[in-house]
Amino acid sequence: MLLEKALSACFSAQKENRFLYHIPADFPAFEGHFPGNPLLPAVCQMGLCAEAFSRQSGKKQEIAAVSRAKFMRPILPNSTVILAFIPRPDGQYLAELTDEKGQKFSQLICSFKEAL
């Protein structure tokens, strides 16, 4: 629950299927991951996907499955993350997390389900 609130607080804007997040230096996950060399943990990146998909669908969502995840660059303190969903024919979504220049931080192929 704490993670959900922290991720929701990072939300800045939405343009169509693109969601803008600013990850501040005081984001709670940076304290322990890793001291002296902070980066946003993969679980937080997946949490951003669920948070954004909830905004898109209008209902609270959680990740049902991740069939592939690729982490290309670390998300550091004070980063801006643009998250976009691309629907796939198999019912899953390609979630791409990029910076303002379009350089990828990570991408996940995932499916969602309504949270209980």
Q: Model regions: which residues?
A:
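Catalytic strand-loop segment that frames the active site of acyl-thioester-processing enzymes
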Residues: 1-40
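A broad structural signal for short, well-ordered beta-strand segments within beta-sheet-rich domains
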Residues: 6-11, 63-66, 105
